[in-house]
Amino acid sequence: MSKTNESLLKRRQAAVPRGVGQIHPVVAERAENSTVWDVEGREYIDFAGGIAVLNTGHLHPKVIAAVQEQLGKLSHTCFQVLAYEPYIELAEEIAKRVPGDFPKKTLLVTSGSEAVENAVKIARAATGRAGVIAFTGAYHGRTMMTLGLTGKVVPYSAGMGLMPGGIFRALAPCELHGVSEDDSIASIERIFKNDAQPQDIAAIIIEPVQGEGGFYVNSKSFMQRLRALCDQHGILLIADEVQTGAGRTGTFFATEQLGIVPDLTTFAKSVGGGFPISGVAGKAEIMDAIAPGGLGGTYAGSPIACAAALAVLKVFEEEKLLERSQAVGERLKAGLREIQAKHKVIGDVRGLGSMVAIELFEGGDTHKPAAELVSKIVVRAREKGLILLSCGTYYNVIRFLMPVTIPDAQLEKGLAILAECFDELA
């Protein structure tokens, strides 16, 4: 009996908790670069990239070769028991790429949430303080601490009770929705006045470009003001680059373009080229704040994932993927603005590098998010062979996270499909 999407999704429903969501009713069978085929043989252009995990594409040959070579040597020891060179080398290479002219160290773990959890642990240990300030619209993960940091309750933490204490919420700057940079800084000052003194705050954590929140790009001026505020009060600045990192924004880390040096940087997703690896990198004296045994994990920094990540770094250099990311982003934004010129429902085209999004409003009114239309476009695009992702606090944003290795012809085809969807539905 041949497999179908429907039959496998029925099995999924019976076997997998409903809390594990499903964006598209599709079961993937194989993939290559920016193309995915489902179990029924249908072909899709992938503008989702596993949610920013596949900047180097599905199954990049050099990444797969590195993994195969590592599998022939060593699959696991637990780094805390027996060290191995791929972890050490990757820690060195990430430290070279993190902004800052000072000694750095790198912790490797497995998921983005785990990286953020450890960044908070390190910040608290280094400062002797407990408080953390995060922003409205932020997304930092699905573990309890990261849920507390995340600035959206539904669907992430609804019904789960109180989140961990010591977390305070500042306004994220977003001129489109009436929150200026001054408003954001003032909201932090209000926290200092009303909720926690500056000397009780260990860290401020921020995404250089908000991910799930809607791809709002923080300006260079705002990031510099935030850096100055942290320096004034001895607060550590954590840049959550889980989604922005690994070249998505046209530089390896987005903060390179924003004029600031974070104390700690988290990374994950595309660093592993499809393999699970993440980490925290930062000033050596801060990273060393926790005593031996306080950091790590059984699978943290798997030798297989480290081999994949090292190959990803080489691919970025050999194939000039930072430049390619910028070029893909420029063409993408130009194509989206062409669609916008015909359809005023697109209120904004924005992004940094190839981390690009469009935001839709009914009748062009920024007080009326067009969430229903976004949902319809995502469905129609899939029916036409294009995989899209939505996001945003109001569910009215379409984000684009295709591999930066996508061929030009396929990028153009994807844009043409998207234009058709707007012509039919908007």
From Swiss-Prot:
Transmembrane segments annotated in the record for this chain: none
Record's keyword terms, sorted: Aminotransferase, Pyridoxal phosphate, Transferase
Positions of modified residues (N6-(pyridoxal phosphate)lysine): K269
Binding residues annotated for pyridoxal 5'-phosphate, in chain numbering: G112, S113, Y139, D240, E241, V242, Q243, T298
Coiled-coil positions: none
BP-aspect Gene Ontology terms: gamma-aminobutyric acid catabolic process; L-lysine catabolic process
Alphabetical list of Pfam families matching this protein: Aminotran_3 (PF00202)
Enzyme class, UniProt record, top EC level: transferase
Entry's EC annotation: 2.6.1.48
GO molecular function: 4-aminobutyrate:2-oxoglutarate transaminase activity; 5-aminovalerate transaminase activity; pyridoxal phosphate binding
Cofactor(s) it depends on: pyridoxal 5'-phosphate
Family per record: Belongs to the class-III pyridoxal-phosphate-dependent aminotransferase family.
Name by which UniProt lists this protein: 5-aminovalerate aminotransferase DavT
Underlying gene: davT
